[in-house]
Amino acid sequence: MAAEEGKDEAGLDQVEEEFSIWKRNTPFLYDLMISHPLEWPSLTLHWVPSTPIPYSKDPYFAVHKLILGTHTSGGAQDFLMVADVVIPTPDAEPGLGGRDQEPIVPKVEIKQKIRVDGEVNRARCMPQKPTLVGAKTSGSEVFLFDYARLSGKPQTSECDPDLRLMGHEQEGYGLAWSSFKEGYLLSGSQDQRICLWDVSATATDKVLNPMHVYEGHQSIIEDVAWHMKNENIFGSAGDDCQLVIWDLRTNQMQHQVKVHEREINYLSFNPFNEWVLATASSDSTVALFDLRKLTAPLHVLSKHEGEVFQVEWDPNHETVLASSGEDRRLMVWDINRVGDEQLEIELDAEDGPPELLFSHGGHKAKISDFAWNKDEPWVISSVAEDNSLQVWQMAESIYREDDEDEDDDDEGNQNAQHSNENQK
């Protein structure tokens, strides 16, 4: 027992030491770094997909919105939360003050709290109506809230969603809105089911049943995701190590492949390339796949220590993606760099493979969720079990060279495409 306590203390000391080193290096590693302590940890995080508005005190800053939740473990009432994030625009000049000549500091402010039953496992906004939020909690229902409708109204102690979406028997985390079909919401849970609702359909007493239930997984479904180019295709993944591709036109599986030896926790379709997707697994890797050949990965990204819980493609750069795991690290990868030579062999090998662009070490506990900001390239928000919410952007010097290379590649690809078309 004493040995275990000593081991725990040593682990905590190591976390504090690593955090201290990270903090000292922050000015050199980041162009933007906001760290905001939350009253309760949030398991979920999502940028509201609406146009940022100019900040009233300084036109060189803009207000972005974030959706968060609370994870109180029964210690208090739980809420879905809307936050304002004030960050500089790309045109902002360093040290620029507001109208009162006081320097404007990037910040996060919780603006709205909406009562929910149970902890918020995951919350996501409808792309076509950004104020409409789907929320999966520690119960089996999925709640739908229009936070604009509730804005300005007194906060109640009752959970009063616009809709209660039924169909699951257990809680879960998988939740995804279709960017093509307005109102289509997918959910995957521990009951091994995937439910699909059309929230624009007529509900009875604010209760809506699924338009279809998909079954085929043999264990907990960890995640669901829509294809980014084909409105009829979606994917699911779970603890049975299976990646499943489904087609709405037949409501059948297109592919079912065991792609990892341990649980698959997340999947993400590339927003630019219709064939490429990524999976995050408890085997400590992120794997990249071609939909035309799922039997073997295109490439495996390895640097995390422990389970990898999330992977998300950058909405602004085709070859860039990020992943997070139980090692408290959020890693940004650029697959354009796969195979690059490493000059300082020993030093570079310690830093990781050449495709590892950046490793964010600002959290002291497991990262629960993170999100790319589509309106501000290279800006990421992340939340962790240590109650921290961080909004950050790596230093331009880290990615600039890669941006230039990507522009050259894009031009080359376009020329090649024109050449192919001419040959046809």
Swiss-Prot record:
UniProt subcellular location: Nucleus
Main location: nucleus
GO cellular component: Cul4-RING E3 ubiquitin ligase complex; ISWI-type complex
N-acetylmethionine sites (modified residues): 1
Compositionally skewed regions (Polar residues) per UniProt: 413-424
Biased composition range(s): Acidic residues: 401-412
GO biological process, one term: chromatin organization
Residue ranges of the region described as Disordered: 394-424
Keywords carried by this UniProt record: Acetylation, Chromatin regulator, Nucleus, Repeat, Repressor, Transcription, Transcription regulation, WD repeat
Motif mapping: DWD box: 233-249
WD repeat start and end residues: 167-207, 216-256, 259-299, 303-343, 362-402
Domain notes for this protein: The DWD box is required for interaction with DDB1A.
Function per UniProt: Core histone-binding subunit that may target chromatin assembly factors, chromatin remodeling factors and histone deacetylases to their histone substrates in a manner that is regulated by nucleosomal DNA.
Family to which this protein belongs: Belongs to the WD repeat RBAP46/RBAP48/MSI1 family.
Name of the protein described by the UniProt record: WD-40 repeat-containing protein MSI3
Gene behind the chain: MSI3
